[in-house]
């Protein structure tokens, strides 16, 4: 953990774990050998909560399903082009096939996406779904939208970025959701990082 100023004092809780840490200037380092929920206090800064979960092999969880690579739909993975329509077409097709839509390492720039039933979205560790900074790209004011969806999973250690502070707020977006779900059942999100919403992260 690195902070702006030299570290004068710190604690790593829960104390019963007796975690040994090293201080070098403005950096605090320590190791854990198992899953843990930790509270780190440094100087008079805000508390830092670390939620450390066991590494999950999400590929193994979908090994019995048909896996469809998003790149097979001719989608740009550099974040240069806005690919909303192509990504949505891929979602619709994979739902029809009751399969897994796989996003390999890359940046996928998009507007609002509507998830469908009977499918799994699997994000690689370095896969980033990056929201557009144009409010006009969000008809229903959400980046990931689920209405009446059932039997849906989004798995993996990738990231979904709502582009809130990245530009959407500056461009006039108000009360947008990063993830919105309504009247859904049997839905699971696991491992995925949801960051930088305009307003609500998950609703």
Annotate the PLM regions.
Residues 1-203:
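Extracellular/periplasmic carbohydrate-active domains that bind, remodel
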